[in-house]
Regions:
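Distinct, well-ordered alpha-helical segments
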Residues: 163-167, 226-238
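Active-site glycine-rich loop that binds ribose-phosphate moieties when present
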Residues: 199-208
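Substrate-binding cleft of carbohydrate-active enzyme catalytic domains
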Residues: 211-222, 228-232, 262-268
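Short His-Asn-centered micro-motif
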Residues: 222-223, 245
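Short hydrophobic/aromatic-enriched beta-strand-loop microsegments
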Residues: 240-246
Length: 415
């Protein structure tokens, strides 16, 4: 089937300058003395009763390439439904991910649709544990049943050219959130943070896509976008946007981290920032060491842009070598972050933009160098306890754990 015929068919488908940055890692943290027992994991009553939602988890790459089942407990990786239940996680932005490997051969559209289809199949297969959510009311209804609510979020391009007909087809399939950037590669309408600037932010096509997503009631995710692209996307949208997973540039000057300027702009529009769980974006000591090693923990444009492989199956074999996704390698003991240090990053955001605009976007199974107290999603209560040690009120913690995500979804998608 020709590309244009495929498209036609698919469209017919029913500045925190006052914050003491140095204090993040210059003094001992409570985490150094926290009892740590992976077999006897504590869960505060607050965490058990709260609505908990993760803004970014990689959950389908393994299932696509290895034929596994998210409803079963894995012996490796970070995320599956049994462990999510143990961690008290009620809902997740399920990342439907297309990595850069698929771009040279222009397989990004095919991969996107097959991963979305797989996600729907996995949800149906495990219907006793999980349901697809299209809006905030769905999430709350599913949560009351004691099931996981899956809110699909696209990471990577549905089409490098930004075909709006394909966007509409994905909406009909149940996709309600899309990251505008093509991961770390600039596409036809928006600049990414790790690639060359082609558009000075976003272009007219990017603004047209934003208007379309506003009309469809789709959440606009600007993680991986350049600073100018974030600012311009916020200005172009009539709805709040999200930055699903990352850190603050004011703490770690990694291009993937959001600047204070962009964070304030996003919050002023009602948006939410999800804090990534990895050391690379949150631990300045680790960042300096990693820079000294002259290694990168992020896929760079060009590293997978060599001669394209002939078939999508050949690309699958290359991606499979990296599953479960991991960029962390070996972390020297002195650079291994504690969960209390991650909580201080959250507090940086609270001081900068307020408690109504902060949340969690772990990137579990996406490769982060996790804090030493967090092995997988079952350890999510560690985040609640770390925020309690900061002296946060129950109300503030509940917002950060999930209510802020729920608010944005309600405002964007309606009921």
């Amino acid at each position: 089937m020709k590309r244009r015929d495929l498209i036609k068919t698919l469209t017919l488908l029913p500045l925190a300058g006052s914050f003491p940055i140095d204090s993040l890692f210059a003094t001992p943290v409570a985490g150094n003395n926290v009892p740590f027992n992976m077999q006897n994991k504590p869960m505060p009553d607050l965490h058990r009763k709260a609505f908990v939602m993760d803004g970014h988890t990689h959950v389908m790459t393994r299932e696509l390439l290895m034929g596994t089942d998210i409803g079963q407990r894995y012996t490796d990786g970070n995320v599956d439904l049994p462990r999510a239940k143990e961690g008290g996680v009620d809902a997740m932005f399920f990342s439907v991910y297309t990595p850069e490997h698929y771009y040279p051969g222009r397989f990004e559209t095919k991969n996107t649709f097959r991963v979305v289809n797989l996600a729907l199949d996995q949800i149906k297969k495990n219907h006793s544990q999980i349901e697809l959510a299209l809006n905030a009311s769905d999430i709350q209804r599913i949560n009351k049943k004691g099931k996981m609510a899956a809110f699909l979020d696209l990471e990577g391009p549905w089409d490098m050219d930004g075909d709006i007909n394909l966007l509409r087809a994905l909406h009909r399939l149940g996709l309600r959130s899309i990251q505008l950037p093509a991961h770390n590669t600039t596409n036809a309408f928006i600049d990414t943070c790790n690639d060359v600037s082609r558009w000075g932010g976003i272009n007219d096509l990017g603004r047209k896509i934003i208007r379309e997503m506003n009309e469809l009631g789709m959440v606009i995710n600007i993680a991986h976008a350049s600073n100018d692209a974030i600012l311009q996307s916020v200005e172009a949208s009539k709805h709040p946007l999200i930055y699903s997973h990352g850190g603050f540039y004011g703490i770690v000057p990694h291009p993937r981290c959001i600047t204070d300027e962009a964070a304030k702009s996003l919050a002023a529009k009602g948006g939410v920032i999800g804090i990534h769980f990895g050391s690379l974006f949150n631990n300045p000591i680790y960042w300096k060491w990693q820079q000294g090693q002259k290694k990168s923990n992020e896929t760079k444009p060009g590293t997978v842009q060599a001669a394209p492989l002939k078939t999508i199956e050949e690309v699958d074999k290359e991606v499979l070598k990296e599953v479960p996704l991991s960029f962390r390698g070996t972390i020297p003991e002195e650079y291994w972050m504690h969960v209390d240090q991650l909580a201080k990053v959250i507090d940086y955001g609270v001081q900068l933009v307020g408690e109504d605009h902060m949340a969690l976007g772990s990137d579990l199974d996406g490769g982060p160098e996790l804090p030493r107290e967090i092995k997988d999603i079952s350890d999510y209560p560690q985040m609640t306890m770390a925020m309690q040690r900061l002296g946060y009120s129950d109300t503030r913690i509940k917002k950060i754990l999930g209510l802020n995500w729920l608010r944005v979804i309600r405002e964007v998608t309606g009921n």
